[in-house]
């Protein structure tokens, strides 16, 4: 199968999307930063099943990386990504350069003259506290992608759960008219959530990284057993991580599944367990619904 059509500029992707819309097609968008794995491809296949046309963006967005993070070394393989996407049902790949999205490129970003989309209080919690400015960058680039691609639907994985909730709220609050479609986390057989950053892990670190899923399972198991005390569930996660020397826990929290506010105890509203840790030098996040 030949690679999907490659688009470089916002104008190109907008013109193509409008042509498809004019033909009566439902347009689906899957935003990614590339280095694609089965988790991304599951989103593309879901979009292909539900939409007439599918656009996948491949853009390593500099504004969602903080100082000292891995923007420069984030894995990039556009040609490999295009081959995978063609097999998954992608019609077009939108892969702009930084200059295509941000005008003057990284120099312009440092000027302080650009307007950004703020993530509000939801974006200040958890990942927002650990990575200041991260969700401002995420909201800004996703808003730009929505404006360029003009999709009917956009597909996001639950693996980045806080990002999903922030984007859902942004789409509602800013009247984008884009349906945000959540998709389940895809995992390795041992439970590790698929992530492009897993490629950074050494074999020893890869084994240690399983502790994140085991921690989430420990909390879910306690909840299934009738434990309602959220702090006890958090301690169950902490204990699993403490037993693995290569894992440095950053947070393990039981939160309301919509507001992401920390809970004192489980109640009638859906709850989520969130976890973030460094395994060696690699930062990983994961989450799970609590019964």
UniProtKB/Swiss-Prot annotation:
What is the annotated localization of this protein?
A: Cytoplasm
Report the SS bond pairs.
none
Enzyme nomenclature, EC number: 6.3.2.1
* Binding residues annotated for beta-alanine, in chain numbering: 64
What chemistry does it catalyse, as a reaction equation?
Answer: (R)-pantoate + beta-alanine + ATP = (R)-pantothenate + AMP + diphosphate + H(+)
Q: Which residues form the active site?
A: 40 (proton donor)
**One biological-process term from Gene Ontology?**
pantothenate biosynthetic process
CDD domains the record matches:
PanC
- Gene Ontology CC terms: cytosol
Role noted for this protein: Catalyzes the condensation of pantoate with beta-alanine in an ATP-dependent reaction via a pantoyl-adenylate intermediate.
Q: Under which name does UniProt file this protein?
A: Pantothenate synthetase
- Tell me the lineage of the source organism: Bacteria, Bacillati, Actinomycetota, Rubrobacteria, Rubrobacterales
Q: Which gene encodes it?
A: panC
